[in-house]
Amino acid sequence: MRMQETAAPARKESLIYTAAAGEKKTVILPDNTKVMLNSGAKLMLSDDFNETERRVDLDGEAFFDVARNPEKLFIVCCRDNEYIVRGTSFNVSSYVNDRFSIVTL
C-alpha cells in the first residue's frame, strides 16, 4: 500500500479586528472604508478583500462609512443576512444572542 500526500487546498487567511469590552475601535479597511466597531464587536475579512468584492463578516455592532466603488459591492454578512451597498454610511447591530439584526441608514 502506498500513501500519497496531497496538498490541502489553499485556505484564505482572514484579518480580524476586535473592540474589547468597554472600548470602541476605528479601522480603515484596504479600500478606505472607515469602520467604527462598538464594544465587543468583531470584524473579519479575508486577505483577498477588495480583489473582486468587498465582503466582511460582523459579530456585534459597527458603523460603516463605505468608500464608494460602483464596480465592487460592499457586503456585510452577519448571522443569516447580507447587507449590500456600493458606497454609503450605515450602522449594523447583530449580536449572536439577539433575535434580529438591526440596520440603520
Model-derived regions, located:
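Short, small/hydrophobic-biased targeting/export segments
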Residues: 13-105
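Single-pass transmembrane signal-anchor helices and their membrane-water interface zones
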Residues: 1-10
